[in-house]
Amino acid sequence: MSRINNKATQLLSAMILAGLACHSMAADSIRIGIAGAKTGPVAQYGDMQFSGARMAIEQINAKGGVDGKQLVAVEYDDACDPKQAVAVANKVVNDGVKFVVGHLCSSSTQPASDIYEDEGIVMITPAATSPELTARGYKMVFRTIGLDNAQGPAAARYIAQLKPTNVAVLHDKQQYGEGIASSVKDILGKEGIKVAMFEGINVGERDYSSILAKLKQANVDFVYFGGYHPEMGLLLRQAKEKGLTARFMGPEGVGNDSISQLSLIHISEPTRPER
């Protein structure tokens, strides 16, 4: 998940100006939808997104707004749930909002973006990393974050440098987690690193003893997990309880203050391909 920085602020302003050329707006203000997870298991990332978008709007307004108009935030909660995201997107349409910062999770961003594209609504996601999102030729969909197919290879090359004996690649069966895990697995194979296991776990499950027993039986010494911090936290805690000494690694979705303080964990971030 990325912070909205000056570049994102500039992009937001540019997109609004481009939109103004297409839409006749007589109002003194421009409503900006902010769509993401206010509730649900990854609400902490949603809080970062909402805070960053609010800050960008404040900064733009402090400089006179866009085309002399002040920006007004309209906030929507999709809980990172695809069905709720579709409901949010339809509400955005019904509310007459023409610009959206969001959504957060790839699995909720993609179905929402279909609606925005059809309705001519500009959408900028600061967090959805699935390559599929911007590979469909859509004209109204943008992002300010890197792609899983760039982060995955970078993570795999880092793992290869550590020279593990047996690697397990786990994921949460979601678009974001499984996508980046698949990328890691593919590159590890090309790097000559044995992937002993590639399996999905169920989001929201409280007991991962079965998968951890498999890891231990396979003598896994390194685990890459594609997903978010709630599941990673449980995996780490239960692995320690069962005496599993493997090192763990995950993408930015597992970044969390409490998890980052635990030993034997590496966290990667979205990145650009090496040139």
Predicted regions and their residues:
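Gram-negative bacterial Sec-dependent N-terminal signal peptides
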Residues: 2-25
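Immediate post-signal peptide segment of exported/extracytoplasmic ligand-binding proteins
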Residues: 25-34, 65-70, 160-163
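Short beta-strand segments enriched in small/hydrophobic residues
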Residues: 29-46, 103, 166-170
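Beta-alpha junction/loop-to-helix N-cap segments that form part of ligand/metal-binding clefts
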Residues: 44-51, 59, 63-138, 144, ...
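Short helix-capping segments at alpha-helix termini
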Residues: 60-68, 118-121, 188-194, 240-245, ...
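Venus flytrap/periplasmic-binding-protein-like
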Residues: 78, 124, 131-133, 245-264
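Extracellular/periplasmic Venus flytrap/periplasmic-binding protein
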Residues: 87, 130-132, 139-243
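Single conserved hydrophobic/aromatic residue that forms the stacking wall/gate
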Residues: 265-275
